Amino acid sequence: YPWLKAHVEEAHRHGLKVLKHCCGHTWPIIHQLAEVYDAYEAIQETAGMDIGKLKPVVGDKTCLWGGIWHEHIIDGTPETIREDARYAFEKAAPGGGYIMGSTHSLAVGAKPENILEMKRCRDEWGTYPIDPTKFV
């Protein structure tokens, strides 16, 4: 990964931040990703990448972006979206370095009511400094 690090360092020299979109099971390389990139996006729970377990391991080195299962955006309900958001905010937001988003993307078939619930959760819980008492 030294060549990746060199590319990111060049971007940093120009004042840029670099996000890594990386699907799948990345535990074997999570420390390298956190060392190189400013943000890690697409934290895919279905591949064993639990945002609540990632935060204490690399949350002080990189921004974590995700938490709302993209499968739930397609097949779930506003209630499942709210559960995903509550878990992500509780586990990843305290101390900063968290951006709420889908675990992948807003795929074809995403339900508008679930996207709107993401926005409601963001509006309700997503302003720093995070207040953990809001999640109950």
Where does each model-flagged region fall?
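Active-site loop segments of alpha/beta catalytic cores
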Residues: 1-136
